[in-house]
């Protein structure tokens, strides 16, 4: 399960001017919350920002910056990744008419918001996993892969037993597909076209990295006839190797 969206970054400019005069060592704290509600972003994250400015033992002014922000949930593989926020700080000390002042200018650049994917008609949402569409019209493995790409998704890759069960449920709703070479299998996004027996995903990742390697039985994959180079799934959720030119139903996936 898996991609990039380009939106302008969000910049927040904070300026604080500290007037020294005869006051004690100044401490500036600012707490900035998320961008205004009217900003159309898909996943706003609260953040907390603070600056502490003081004079050290040598008489120099220093500023300490602290930034805390929320966690973004990235699409592509159901993994939580912390986006990088950039903090730039400039501090200057000036004297005007005998009065010293410290000026701190801080720019916080937040990552661009992630837009929600556009889901084509016919896809069903499975919570946490993604969107799936069962194509009943039989196609070859290559035709199925292209159709999924045209819909903005990809030929499904099974990453867990839970995902296998989702596909089993979709498969169970179709008893027979007219024109299919075999009604016991559906195409999925793995193959061993490059090296026999070494199955990889349509993205070039080894099958072992998907998190799901359960074959339909202990015999598979057997490369029967010497030309079974494309992946399929049995109604029991197990994997099998199938000739790529066969025409089978298939499932497309759009990741969360």
From Swiss-Prot:
<keyword id="KW-0964">Secreted</keyword>
<feature type="propeptide">
    <location>
        <begin position="22"/>
        <end position="33"/>
    </location>
</feature>
<keyword id="KW-1015">Disulfide bond</keyword>
<dbReference type="InterPro" id="IPR001304">
    <property type="entry name" value="C-type_lectin-like"/>
</dbReference>
<dbReference type="GO" id="GO:0030246">
    <property type="term" value="F:carbohydrate binding"/>
</dbReference>
<keyword id="KW-0430">Lectin</keyword>
<keyword id="KW-0106">Calcium</keyword>
<feature type="disulfide bond">
    <location>
        <begin position="148"/>
        <end position="252"/>
    </location>
</feature>
<feature type="signal peptide">
    <location>
        <begin position="1"/>
        <end position="21"/>
    </location>
</feature>
<dbReference type="GO" id="GO:0005576">
    <property type="term" value="C:extracellular region"/>
</dbReference>
<dbReference type="InterPro" id="IPR018378">
    <property type="entry name" value="C-type_lectin_CS"/>
</dbReference>
<comment type="function">
    <text>Participates probably in the elimination of foreign substances invading the insect abdominal cavity, and in trapping intracellular symbionts, when they leak from the mycetomes into the hemolymph.</text>
</comment>
<keyword id="KW-0732">Signal</keyword>
<dbReference type="InterPro" id="IPR016186">
    <property type="entry name" value="C-type_lectin-like/link_sf"/>
</dbReference>
<dbReference type="InterPro" id="IPR016187">
    <property type="entry name" value="CTDL_fold"/>
</dbReference>
<feature type="domain" description="C-type lectin">
    <location>
        <begin position="146"/>
        <end position="256"/>
    </location>
</feature>
<feature type="glycosylation site" description="N-linked (GlcNAc...) asparagine">
    <location>
        <position position="56"/>
    </location>
</feature>
<feature type="disulfide bond">
    <location>
        <begin position="230"/>
        <end position="244"/>
    </location>
</feature>
<dbReference type="InterPro" id="IPR050111">
    <property type="entry name" value="C-type_lectin/snaclec_domain"/>
</dbReference>
<protein>
    <recommendedName>
        <fullName>Hemolymph lipopolysaccharide-binding protein</fullName>
    </recommendedName>
</protein>
<dbReference type="Pfam" id="PF00059">
    <property type="entry name" value="Lectin_C"/>
</dbReference>
<keyword id="KW-0325">Glycoprotein</keyword>
